[in-house]
């Protein structure tokens, strides 16, 4: 059995799989908004699973941002800024008293699809995540293409317009981007989930905004 943790800006989702990849347990809870509490929350999640099943399981965590290849610190975590400049892999491994494998969330998603998902028959796979942010992972021959700056595949941060533009795709189509645009237009703060809920309820303004 093994435990997978998806650390996002708004939630921590955990899953326990058996040796055949069959799901045995799943849980979701709100993400803390600081680094110390994030480490504690993930540790508690793993401990609670192991109390019910088995201790000493393998643990993997996918997270926003990338890991600096020289320092081992997380970088470019725009929607969970408390992770930046932290040696997350070291700290969570120490907290759980075992080696914990950590990787960018979009890379993990794309890699998983390349092995046993909808992209398993393809040599080159590009996976896209649309959540609080806008991420991408590039897989070639079932290996993650990291790039010299650990930023390969991150299409959400491609500038829009001139090369000096500070605008990028994530500012428009991610959850956080939609929230900023919504506030700019209506002067009302709503999270992305609420915006889509109102649109589904046929709110004219919200339907037009989503379009």
For every predicted segment, state its role.
Residues 2-6, 58-60, 125-129, 135:
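Short glycine-aspartate micro-motif
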Residues 2-40, 73-75, 144-163:
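Short glycine-rich, Thr/Ser-proximal phosphate-binding strand/loop in the N-terminal lobe
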Residues 18, 63, 140-141:
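A cytosolic small-molecule/anion-sensing beta-strand core signal
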Residues 27-57, 167, 171, 177-211:
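Adenine-nucleotide phosphate-binding core of ATP-dependent small-molecule kinases
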Residues 32, 36-43, 47, 55-59, ...:
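Glycine-rich phosphate-binding loop and adjoining helix at the ATP-binding site
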Residues 64-67, 131-133:
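Short glycine-rich anion-binding loops that position phosphate/pyrophosphate groups of nucleotides
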Residues 120-172:
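Glycine-rich phosphate-binding loop of actin/hexokinase-like ATP-binding domains
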């Amino acid at each position: 059995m093994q435990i997978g943790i998806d650390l996002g800006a708004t939630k921590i989702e955990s899953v326990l799989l058996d040796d055949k990849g069959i799901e045995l347990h799943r849980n979701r809870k709100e993400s803390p908004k600081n680094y110390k509490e994030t480490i504690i929350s993930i540790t508690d999640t793993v401990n609670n699973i192991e109390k019910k099943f088995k201790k000493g399981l393998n643990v993997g965590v996918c997270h926003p941002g990338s890991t600096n290849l020289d320092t081992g610190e997380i970088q470019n975590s725009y929607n969970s800024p408390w992770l930046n400049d932290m040696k997350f892999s070291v700290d969570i491994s120490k907290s759980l008293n075992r080696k914990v494998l950590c990787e960018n969330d979009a890379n993990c998603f794309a890699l998983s699809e390349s092995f046993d998902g909808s992209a398993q028959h393809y040599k080159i796979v590009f996976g896209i995540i649309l959540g609080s942010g806008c991420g991408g992972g590039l897989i070639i021959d079932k290996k993650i293409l990291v790039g010299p700056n650990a930023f390969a595949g991150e299409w959400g941060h491609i500038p829009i317009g001139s090369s000096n533009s500070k605008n990028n795709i994530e500012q428009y189509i991610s959850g956080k981007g939609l929230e900023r645009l919504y506030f700019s237009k209506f002067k009302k703060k709503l999270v992305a989930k609420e915006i889509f809920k109102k649109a589904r309820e046929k709110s004219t303004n919200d339907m037009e905004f989503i379009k």
